[in-house]
Amino acid sequence: MKSFKNFYIRNNNLVQLQNTSFESPLITTNSYVYYGDLSLAQKQNFKWIAGGNSLLPQGPILINDTTVWGFTVPFPSGNQCLALQSTSFIEQSMYMTTGLHTISFYYHTRTGDSGNPINIVIDNSIIGTTSSVAVNSWTFFSQTFTTLISGNVIVKLEGTLSTTTGIDNIIVV
């Protein structure tokens, strides 16, 4: 368990994570699209800030019910998931109260890849990392942490290696 002293209040509005199963924007069934190829309207509907990945187009990959990326279908929640390829990332602001919290999600290594560990980052502090061992099915990950001050924080998931890992159904309580 990790504690944080450097959280700060950005505003007093209650904010929760949005689009945690990546169902928006809806893309064509049996397809995928890189974040860098989304239209401005699609990026706004995505709700996450995304980037990274030195490959072009940049950013993570939104996937709808296809096995092309080597992830087991069905996905844990809904018809879409997100793949963090190389050092791509997603981040979003949310409100957290003082106390104990848990972040959880499902992850899956791309078939044929070694694991791409995913760092879980809260306001620039890594609070956990998924296993570096390749997993060929959707695997549940959970990390508990403590916040010492209530306020809005940045929740970020980021790839660390040059391989690909799918994620879905992010929950923070």
What are these regions (language model features)?
Residues 124-130:
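Surface-exposed loop/edge segments in extracytoplasmic proteins
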